């Protein structure tokens, strides 16, 4: 994850007080834990944010770049907001791997003229405790990472959809160190008739620099995705697949499906292939919707790190007020 202090040479260490040594040891221990348990590449700042958001998408194994038809599209593929025609409010909460790492998201999207507009807030945090060189516990603290993102999407001459995010990152070590930085995402989505769709995204283009108040810097690594989706049986069945790329090497592969047994009930499943397709883990989930209220749950079966339960809810104000048509299948 992040490094809140610049490296200390031997002369500096000799002058550090016992209290500061406890802070340094405790902070480094926490950083090692967070880096080890993060999904995806698991390296770099804001690693937990690479997991994605929303129980619906995560239950499909994260294969959502070419789907992107709900409020979480602002993270998965900002271009997807241009295919909505109502106002939506959504949120997500989870404890990653059951290890006390909280990951939350709240967002709102709407349409204006030919544009899709979104505003979201994402947060990840973990509580820790300073430990001195003798192993004795000291002060408790909470490491927090947040991002505020604004999304704009539009239709490009009826050829496809394009979208972009501007993100403001903030980090707080809980020990008096803070950092921030701006990042940018781009997304494209092309519907090939009523059945096929393809999408590509570039998140944190060229890497996002996070600057600490003390002068140190960290980087949110760039991540690039390409995906395709098929909508069958009048949109009641969705099959999707995504591929990750870090700019140098291929990353994880994501395959997922969603089947609406009836309009009000959907079942989902997916698989994520990791480590050059040598390892994998599964995801399952379900969702219900009643009069524009969508409630979704996902369960990530990650044997090594631990299982994760994700809960999400989304309101479609257009549906509730009778003012919009349903575009995506939730």
Question: Which residue ranges define each predicted feature?
Answer:
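Subset of outer-membrane beta-barrel
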Residues: 41-330
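Cleavable N-terminal export/targeting peptides
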Residues: 1-47, 319-330
